[in-house]
């Protein structure tokens, strides 16, 4: 079976989209654990000067330092009083409507979800 360059590009884009979707699953798991530091360390391109995070109710934070500071500060300010063992909790994450666009060069992507 010969796979041409166009088909190979389509397969790679599909694999990239799947990997990004799997990252969202990891994000939800880490949110359940209130682990903002790991969210930043594991899921953000922390060595990229253009890294950013945007939450509709909190604004946009650009650059590695601002992105990390937001993640850690947000969790500390908003979730530090919540018990970590979650005894008696019923967690439900509705993470849907994914929109993942891989750049033409395949080097970057942008993604949004309704959470």
Regions found by a protein language model. Name each.
Residues 1-38, 42-46:
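Short, low-complexity N-terminal intrinsically disordered segments enriched in polar/charged residues
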Residues 37-114:
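A solvent-exposed, acidic/Ser-Thr-rich amphipathic alpha-helical stretch
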């Amino acid at each position: 079976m010969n796979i041409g360059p166009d088909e190979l590009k389509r397969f790679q884009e599909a694999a990239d989209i799947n990997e990004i979707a799997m990252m969202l699953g990891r994000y939800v798991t880490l949110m359940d654990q209130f682990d903002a530091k790991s969210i930043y360390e594991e899921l953000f391109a922390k060595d990229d000067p253009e890294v950013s995070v945007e939450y509709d109710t909190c604004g946009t934070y650009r650059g590695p330092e601002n992105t990390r500071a937001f993640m850690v500060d947000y969790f500390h300010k908003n979730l530090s009083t919540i018990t970590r063992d979650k005894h008696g909790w019923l967690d439900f994450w509705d993470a849907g409507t994914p929109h993942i666009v891989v750049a033409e060069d395949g080097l970057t992507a942008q993604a949004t979800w309704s959470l």
